[in-house]
A protein has these predicted regions:
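Scaffold/interface architecture of coatomer-like assemblies
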Residues: 20-304
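Bacterial N-terminal signal peptides that target proteins for export
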Residues: 1-10
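Hydrophobic h-region of N-terminal signal peptides that target proteins for export
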Residues: 10-20
Length: 304
């Protein structure tokens, strides 16, 4: 028998023996969806003692089986997105102090980055836990007049989804006016945020705006926060941000983490609407992202 035939026969026998020893493995790659949910009572206070049995999750109207459930203070990748336009000059010091206060009240293992924006966004501090680096970035004032909030949020989402070391991703945006300089459409920003399970919180310092412009800004901020499970705040005076920042930090650290494997595993690119219900007399409101897009890039997990 030729040498090549002898080698082939030996290899066949070895593989046959190996397959006889080892059972066949069947692998599954079920797609998971991770939700970060906030429960509130009628006074807007957090409800933090709910059991798994109180929750029901629906996707496109179909009840889903909850695979895991916990309330845990997990570290987050946190982005601070701060308006640096000319109209913010007198407010920046107060906003910077409140932003640093939020970081100090957050999980010590958080990683934080800062994007300042006027007519264009600027990444002024990459992920860090060093207060001095954050303070330096927040002190940067290079105002050019315009407000490109949507572009800044898109920059922040792209940054956090590509560089984050923590599973949970949160952005806090502070602005004092309606967006007048962005190229990025609002619906695109919302879609990308939902797709990457980024929670967005917004502080709109809009008291100096005309009613029409303030209304436009509110509609945009509310659309962002409602779609992602965050919250919008509209203080009448910048001093109120000292109260709002701790509220945001407290909420981020006291959310429920609910995971389910969709009964519809098709990756057809369609939008899957999510609705969470809580059966508890003390709960008035439950917030989480409103849905996600079933695309191939979410094959293993939608928002983990």
């Amino acid at each position: 028998m030729p040498a090549r035939s002898l080698k082939s026969a030996a290899l066949f026998l070895a593989l046959s023996a190996l397959s006889a020893q080892e059972p066949t493995l069947f692998r599954t790659d079920s797609r998971l969806v991770v939700l970060h949910a906030t429960a509130e009572d009628k006074e807007g206070r957090l409800v933090m003692d709910l059991p798994k049995t109180a929750f029901q999750v629906y996707e496109n109207g179909v009840l889903q089986e909850i695979k895991s459930f916990r309330k845990e203070d997990v570290p987050v990748s946190l982005g601070l997105i701060i308006d640096n336009s000319a109209s913010m000059t007198d407010k920046r010091a107060r906003v910077a102090a409140a932003a640093l206060g939020l970081v100090k009240l957050s999980n010590p293992e958080d990683e934080v980055f800062i994007v300042n924006f006027d007519e264009a966004p600027s990444l002024d501090a990459d992920f860090t836990s060093d207060p001095k680096q954050l303070q330096k970035a927040l002190a940067r004032i290079d105002s050019r007049g315009g407000t490109a909030m949507r572009d800044a949020l898109r920059t922040a989402i792209d940054h956090v989804k590509g560089r984050n070391k923590k599973d949970k991703k949160v952005l806090v945006v502070v602005t004092d006016g309606n967006d007048n300089s962005s190229l990025e459409p609002l619906d695109t920003v919302i879609r990308v945020a939902q797709q990457n399970d980024v929670l967005i919180y917004a502080v709109g310092l809009l008291s100096d705006e005309t009613p029409r412009e303030a209304d436009k800004a509110k509609r945009a901020l509310d659309a962002l926060t409602r779609a992602t499970g965050g919250q919008s705040y509209y203080p009448q005076d910048v001093s109120e941000i000292d109260r709002i920042a701790p509220q945001i930090a407290h909420e981020i650290r006291n959310q429920y983490i609910v995971t389910y494997s969709p009964s519809n595993q098709e990756l057809d690119g369609s939008f899957r609407q999510i609705r969470v219900l809580v059966d508890s007399p003390g709960v008035k409101n439950i917030r989480t992202r409103s849905g996600y897009y079933a695309t191939p890039d979410n094959r293993k997990s939608a928002g983990s």
